[in-house]
Swiss-Prot record:
Thiolesterase that catalyzes the hydrolysis of S-D-lactoyl-glutathione to form glutathione and D-lactic acid. It comes from Bartonella henselae (strain ATCC 49882 / DSM 28221 / CCUG 30454 / Houston 1) (Rochalimaea henselae). One of its GO terms (biological process) is methylglyoxal catabolic process to D-lactate via S-lactoyl-glutathione. This is Hydroxyacylglutathione hydrolase. One of its GO terms (molecular function) is metal ion binding. Monomer. InterPro entries: Clx_II_MBL, Glyoxalase_II_hydrolase, HAGH_C, Hydroxyacylglutathione_Hdrlase, Metallo-B-lactamas, RibonucZ/Hydroxyglut_hydro.
């Protein structure tokens, strides 16, 4: 499977996936029509499907135009169908389905929104997490609770280390600066942050990244880490309380 990733709007990631066997192409979300059209032209692909991670406008804004041009089928979370115009098919939480020759699991990952989905390709070890999980960060809790988001991140943390993470926004530099305030002596985090700063200085993208790296560096996947808990002075608190405190600090960072 081929993947084309690009920046659109200001900091959204656009992502196209292409099954070489069937010739099918899908977009993960629809943030900006022109950027997606240009990416399709670069690769000489035609859009058949759009997979939506959640209903926020910066992920669905281009639906009407892309449907009109390509007659693409829009597939998204059943729990958010009333909030998404132009949706054609819905997916139940944790439903599996085929894209060309590839199996996809539509993992239910509520927190950022209540119906948010993350698309996992188990054979290829690919994860498209939308705004649930970012490199060195996670999504704000616009609709869900800390408990819901923590459970979603626990689900994603169980995926194999070699899984490649793609997400909805290029937030890695600001996330790295925050992560270093909580985990300043983490050498792997220091190295990742240095790499990120160099990439962003060149206006280069910081994704994809492996989940294995994120498990070592991302504070939102390290709620049970002793060193991090000690820094927070929360050595005996529950996982949910620790996660909620990290999220609160990031909201105010």
């Amino acid at each position: 499977m081929l993947i084309e990733q690009f920046i659109c709007r200001e900091d959204n990631f656009g992502v196209l996936i292409h099954d070489e066997t069937s010739g099918y192409t899908a977009a993960i979300d629809a943030p900006e029509s022109n950027a997606i059209q240009n990416a399709l032209k670069r690769r000489n692909w035609t859009l058949q499907t759009i997979f939506l991670t959640h209903h926020h406008h910066d992920h669905v804004e281009a639906l009407a135009e892309l449907k009109q041009i390509y007659k693409a089928i829009v597939i998204g979370p059943e729990a958010e169908k009333e909030k998404i115009s132009h949706i054609d098919q819905t997916l139940k939480p944790d439903e599996s389905f085929l894209f060309g020759t590839h199996t996809i699991l539509a993992l239910s990952t509520p927190g950022h929104t209540l119906g948010a989905l993350s698309y996992y390709f188990p054979q290829e070890n690919l994860l498209f997490a939308g705004d649930t999980l970012f490199s060195l960060g996670c999504g704000r809790l616009f609709e869900g609770t800390p408990a819901q988001m923590l459970n979603s991140l626990k689900k994603l943390r169980q995926l194999p280390d070699e899984t490649l993470l793609y997400c909805g926004h290029e937030y890695t530099k600001s996330n790295a600066l925050f992560a270093l305030t909580l985990d300043p002596y983490n050498q792997k985090l220091q190295q990742r942050a240095e790499d990120v700063f160099l990439l962003r200085a060149k206006n280069a993208m910081t994704l994809p990244v492996t989940l294995g790296q994120e498990k070592k560096n991302n504070p939102f996947l390290r709620w049970d880490n002793r060193t991090l808990r000690k820094t927070l002075r929360m050595e005996k608190e529950t996982d949910e309380e620790v996660f909620a405190e990290i999220r609160k600090r990031k909201d105010n960072f």
